[in-house]
Structures are given as C-alpha cells and as structure tokens.
Amino acid sequence: DMIATYTGFSLVFMQGLKKLGIEISSEEEKGVFHLWKYIGYLLGIPPQFLPENRQYAVEQLYWWTTIQEQGDEDSAHLAKALLQENLDNTIYKYSFQRKMLLRLHQSMNWHLLDEEINQRLQIPKPHKAFSIFPKIVRKGNLVSQKIYLRNFQQYQKLVEMGSLQQLKVLDDYIKHTPKDFNY
C-alpha cells in the first residue's frame, strides 16, 4: 500500500496535472520523483521499490495493480470522508459555499478518474453545470502557461504566484479552524 501511495503522489499526481493542462518539464518531473523517493525512504519503503523515473514508476504501478484487489467498502468510506470534509470545513461561513466546494471537487474527481473508479468509490456524479469546471481549470492553465512560460522570469513569477496562493489557503485554514475543532 505504501508503494501505491508513493506512486500516487508522484506518477499519478503528474498525470492529473497534465490532464488539467499543466506542462511539466523533465527537470520538474525528475524533481517530483526525487522528492517522493526521499519521502518514501523516510516512510520505510525499501529503496529497490522507489522509482526514480516515469518508466520505473509505471512498471511499479502496473505490478501493484496486478496484486491488489479492487477497491472495497473501505475505499468508498475513505472517498466519502474526503468529500464530507468539504461540508465540515470551517473556511467558508455559509453552507451553500461548502456545498459548492463539494460539487466542484466531485466534478474534478469525475474528470481525473474514469467512470468505473468513480462508481466503485461511490462518488456522486456532478450535475452538468459543475462538469464544466474542470474544463475551465484546464483552459485557464493552458492560457496562463502561454503567458508565463515564455521565459524564465515569467516562469518564476508564475511559481511565486502559486506559492502565495498556497500560503493563503493554508492561512485561511489556520485562521478559520476553531482551536477546539474536531471531526
């Protein structure tokens, strides 16, 4: 399971980004594998099972899927709990905002995973209005990359903007989560 998690956070993560229109350079890909190889090592995964590149990661994922059973009831419960977090989080003040976030996340799941997996995980299919969201995200990514990937300085600006956005999300979670909040 740890190998599958490792592969999910490296190979499958990058495939999802590409599906959302993000161009990943070979240097960035190498960096992601290096990061997750180190994390896998710290988690105790034997080094021989830690892929250094896409080819080896694909082989590992294929090997893992041949010995792993289909998703079970526990997998569906985990998916349900992850989606429920959208409704339980305290970042958004109003219920309708949290429901909107849930629908957007469901639409991304249906875009990134195939129909069989979504059904097996019992992820509700989003309403048609929400199914356009991943297409908007993809288009936005493609446009921003055309603007910011022209040269190194523009690329650095894009990286810095992304970093600031991530820090804002983290700050929002910290600011809006009550100190005594428990799931």
Q: What residues fall within each predicted segment?
A:
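Mature, function-bearing regions of proteins
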Residues: 1-183
